[in-house]
Amino acid sequence: MEEFKRYLELDRSQQHDFLYPLIFQEYIYALAHDHSLTTSSSLELEKAGYENNSSLLIVKRLIIHLITQMDHFGFFTNYSSQNPFLGHNTTLYSQILLEGFVVVVEIPFSIRIISSLDLEGKEIVKSHNFRSIHSIFPFLEDKFSHLNYVLDLLIPHSIHLEILVQTFRYWVKDASSLHLLRTFLHKYHNWTNLITPKKSRFSFSKQNKRFLFFFSNFHVYEYESILAFLRNQSSHLHSKSYRPFLDRIYFYEKRDHFVKVFTKYFQAILWSFKDPFMHYVRYQGKALLASKGTFLLMNKWNYYLVNFWQCYFYMWSQPGRIHINKLSNHYLELLGYLSSVGLNSSMVRNQMLENSFLIANVSKKFDMIVPIIPLIRSLSKAKFCNLLGHPISKPVWADLSDSDIIDRFGSIYRNISHYYSGSSKKMSLYRIKYIIKLSCARTLARKHKSTVRAFLKRVGSELLEEFFFEDEFIFSLTFPKASSSSGGLYRTRIWYLDIFCIHDLANYE
């Protein structure tokens, strides 16, 4: 935010209507380059050749070509033989231009956020902890335990390219920028799989993750903002997170059209939004809509969402993508956890004068458990065990040193242990530890051409325990009371604030 505010001191008339000239500025590509260095790993940069190929000289050549050539979009055509100036670097120039373009199109959104916060006298708080995936689970524990039904839906993503361009036109009215956006979208035509983690978009995400994340979030934000707008029209519980964006002309045009077509039924439709206990959570291209209402109310939400996507975004949503489940008797597959709302019963003895009696107290509890079967299936897919959960060796790691092999296996277990540290029933992690630990021993024995028993007898079993119990030792120092009792370590629930991505083994769908 501060980078945009420092570098992009634009005139008010240029903030939205004349973004295209910024593509000719060198500092735009410097910002894109710095962002790639800070957000990408060295391995990704090495594979992409970014460190070796990106330089100020290449950027200057790119800008000169954009200024002198009439065809600014020639990077996307196969004419390298006709243009000796570009030669074999057409792909590189196209990639650099794409990265600079993403920085440019982010400007209206960033300026709108900064200006709205300045008007309200608020500061931009860097709440990095709220980015953690684990931050969502305490919210679910606090809210979902009082709810009855949940709408589990898969967000439709197959939107037409021109629909996206037309929607984006309300943010950026610069025709040249829109033409460049259309060119990028048609070049990377498999962008329609942005939302769901499919293999078809893997190659695209490797080329420019920032473009991927920006337009996937923009696509989802469009319909979420309209839902928030309608929600705020019928409830006093206004959502502050959408306030900076709700004054757009686009939303009011949609609202006016909505009222014009459904004037007679507008109040009846808004009745569906009047549930004060409605909660919305989005994750991995999916969403949860939970309510304390009845099955009839959730069915109305189902009907509305399907028609909403089809009428306003021309996206077909199959009825099988939306499921209405009762929280008390159905498990939710949420971010690698199995979650449900169960009944927690307890007996309280009450004494009144000479009479004593027992009172049965029943309360709801939102419970998360480790999905052991999908985890074993993921370990089997990664060649740590077979489908029955029997550990096997990892031959591809046999050429590494002993310390590297142990460190890799230990790191995998620590990641899994951290991710599922918030589960109330973590005893199944014993089996995961057994699989990874014995797979490590089999790999080391394979490397030294020995049996597992002979290898452990020669080096001692403490060699593996040191790595696999390191996390538990640190936990016992931090929470001595929890670890002092038998099994206390596996009964205590801990949510971490540094988990920003789902572990590969947890992403088993």
From Swiss-Prot:
Keywords: Chloroplast, mRNA processing, Plastid, RNA-binding, tRNA processing. Pfam families: Intron_maturas2, MatK_N. GO terms for cellular component: chloroplast. It comes from the Eukaryota. One of its GO terms (molecular function) is RNA binding. Coiled coil: none annotated. InterPro entries: Domain_X (IPR024937), Maturase_MatK (IPR002866), Maturase_MatK_N (IPR024942). The keyword Acetylation does not apply. GO terms for biological process: mRNA processing; RNA splicing; tRNA processing. It is found in: Plastid, Chloroplast. The keyword Metal-binding does not apply. HAMAP family: MatK. PANTHER family: MATURASE K. Belongs to the intron maturase 2 family. MatK subfamily. Usually encoded in the trnK tRNA gene intron. Probably assists in splicing its own and other chloroplast group II introns. This is Maturase K. It comes from Hottonia palustris.
